Amino acid sequence: MMSRCGIVSAGNMLVDHVHQIAHWPQPGWLVEIEHSQRATGGAPLNVLLTLARMETGLPLAALGLIGCDADGDYILQMLAQYQVDSGRVRRSETAMTSMSQVMTEPGGQRTFFHAPGANRLLDLGDFDALHSNHKIFHLGYLLLLDSLDCPDEEFGTRSARLLAQMQQRGYQTSLDLVSRQGDPRYRPLVLPALRWLDYLVINELEAGEFTGLTLRTANGSLQQSLMAQAAEQLLQAGVRRRVVIHCPEGAYGLESGGEARWQPSWQMREAEIVGSVGAGDAFCAGVLYASHEDWPLVETLQLAHACARFNLLCANAIDGARPLPELQDFIRRQPPAG
């Protein structure tokens, strides 16, 4: 049997219109936009274009639904520029390309105004022809894919059915969520998918919503002692290989064999942070590449943190991505983390 190689990523495809503002205004007041730029966004594009800019040589492919409009043209141009296979990206004649207006404040804090557009229509039938030789299938974001978030009598949700199909076709599977505080759908939509997952990479807010654990207190302090408990819950719920929970302070990884690790983030000054759009996807790209290459957990988390760190140096989701040798050189030059 031919060995599998590469990553195919599917789900929310959109264009981020990123605006730099000096501060968030009070209701009824005006604040000037100091700088604007357009960039691709959403889990598949952020992960794939980060991996492409890492220059790893892995075959990369995208699957999604976009509109017949300028934003859709831009997405296809970006995929072509970075030599990502776009043959499975379909265009809708009835729905616009999804887009977000992103307001970024000094220090990197951002607020999203999102129009789902064509992503709402992505459904199981769009995956019928996916029988590629890629090793990993990455889906994102659950809770923002209306058709795939619908109930399924046998699997619980249509996204769970999709992930089961992908595993049955020989892919290792990975899933990303969206951060939605207080969304009552977290457990009913996420739980059915976990048993069909090899990798789950989420942030502490998403992990807290699913597990019910308060990983960050009301004053913003991280409850690091509960990160292990949350990861264990997610692994026990069905994830087969790795659970990684990341946050600005660091990341906790847990493997099915029992290996666990807390890895602090690489230190940055606040003045260095330009934006955090796509930082979680950059982190995820690092985890997926390292997992594809069967790297140990410690090295996996270090690479993921390096990907996220360089992401923070730019306003959009991909411009901060660096070639893999540069990331590895950065890691080697860092003092040992506690």
Task: Write out the residue ranges for each language-model feature.
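Ribokinase/PfkB-type carbohydrate-kinase core domain
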Residues: M1-V15, D73-R91, A95, V102-W262, ...
